[in-house]
Amino acid sequence: FLDLFPCDAMFGMHNAPGKPAGKFMAVPGAAMSSSDSAIVTVSGKGGHGAMPHASVDPVVAAASIVMALQTIVARNVPPLEVGIVTVGAIHAGEAPNVIPDTAELRLTVRAFRPEVRDLLERRIVEIAQAQAAVFGATATVDYQRRYPVLYNHPEQTALCEQVVRDWLGDDGLMPERAPVTGSEDFAFFLEKVPG
């Protein structure tokens, strides 16, 4: 894109349902979090629910992984940093009396700093593999880095604020300047040019 349309700076807006219409919020620095996804596949050995001793239950291992993942933010991310690990989906089996061969967890992972993003990825893989091993199962993690942190450069943010003031007065700017943990693909552009 920037090869076709070279520029010195780039500007964009993201609508925010629930915020007042006709108002603007400008957040300098990290304004929106990175967004990654992970699919954790836990492999065991299926069997009959009446004979669990003859199987390796991936559902129990997956449940343990879900609980252990909750310790990453509580015990690995520094207290003044933001890290989010959410298990949004669990898929396993089709029948109540059959232990399946596999279970799958789907995660969304958010951070504002590259160091925290790296930490979250590393710990998700470590925990998934170690917890699965406790139950005699294995786990693979397909980790996908999707959207980077949206970083608003201070000089361009100040320019945007001045444009809003000139257009709408001081009331056009919301006093709130807190970053949000949603993500935005405009962040890819701001990795290349200020904005």
Where are these regions (language model features)?
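Histidine/acidic-residue-rich, glycine-tolerant segments that coordinate divalent metal ions
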Residues: F1-A89, G93-P100, S183-E184
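Metal-dependent amide/peptide-bond hydrolase catalytic core
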Residues: V60-G195
